[in-house]
């Protein structure tokens, strides 16, 4: 029963389950029964896998948004990572709904006239979605934390990660520095929205970045 109903939301539960599966495989190894051999071939699937949907902002904010929104609206346990470059990177750096207001990119040479679509806010409005932003170059411990929390949440999870791109116009050798500046300037605030905190009577919103200390240039 422990093998079938093991709690594997946290790392300790997964480690315990690996131990149970190892014991099961040891016992099955001594049997020549076809059913035992069949079970041994699939026993490792009793260990919970970490599965993520990964896509860029062109997919998440624009051409694939309808499907993404449908998934987030449902109560299923699914993890989604959006790598947000704020432009259509694969096709040369054109303006997208992820591009912030005033930004210069292809198709908005005079500066984008409309605001960036707030994907994280839209997702958090559902109330049952775990939502977080991340920028590992600015705060790697926060990035690790949001992945851990998203993985452990029994429902839809969305992480929107700031992703430097050559279309931004700087040498990619400095991508971590650019992430740091994006957070320090307030361009990319780091936060978490965890519905579990609301269920416990607390505030589900946690701001992980400090007040802006750098100008936006």
Language model region names:
Residues 1-38:
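N-terminal leader/propeptide and maturation segments of large enzyme subunits in energy/redox metabolism
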Residues 1-8, 75, 174-179:
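Short intrinsically disordered, low-complexity coil segments enriched in acidic
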Residues 5-9, 45-47, 99-152:
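Conserved thiamine diphosphate
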Residues 20-29, 37-40, 119-128, 134:
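An acidic, phosphate/nucleotide-engaging active-site surface
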Residues 31-94, 131, 137-150, 154:
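Thiamine diphosphate
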Residues 62, 70-78, 82-98, 103-117, ...:
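Residues forming the flavin
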Residues 137, 143-217:
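Glycine/aspartate-rich loop-and-adjacent alpha/beta segment that forms the canonical ThDP
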């Amino acid at each position: 029963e422990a093998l079938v109903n093991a709690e594997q939301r946290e790392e300790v539960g997964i480690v315990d389950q690996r131990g149970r599966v190892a014991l099961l495989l040891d016992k099955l190894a001594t049997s020549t029964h076809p059913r035992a051999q069949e079970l041994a071939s699939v026993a490792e699937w009793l260990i919970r896998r970490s599965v993520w949907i990964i896509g860029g902002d062109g997919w998440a904010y624009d051409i694939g948004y309808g499907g993404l929104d449908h998934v987030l609206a449902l109560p299923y346990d699914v993890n989604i990572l959006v790598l947000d470059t704020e432009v259509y990177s694969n096709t040369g750096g054109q303006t997208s709904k992820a591009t912030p207001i005033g930004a210069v990119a292809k198709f908005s040479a005079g500066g984008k006239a409309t605001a960036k679509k707030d994907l994280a806010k839209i997702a958090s409005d559902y109330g049952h979605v775990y939502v977080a932003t991340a920028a590992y170059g600015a705060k790697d411990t926060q990035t690790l934390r949001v992945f851990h929390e998203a993985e452990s949440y029994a429902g839809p999870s969305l992480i929107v990660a700031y992703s430097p791109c050559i279309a931004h116009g700087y040498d990619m050798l400095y991508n971590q520095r650019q992430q740091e500046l994006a957070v320090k300037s307030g361009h990319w605030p780091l936060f978490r929205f965890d519905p579990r905190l609301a269920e416990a009577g607390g505030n589900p919103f946690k701001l992980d970045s400090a007040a802006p200390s750098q100008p936006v240039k």
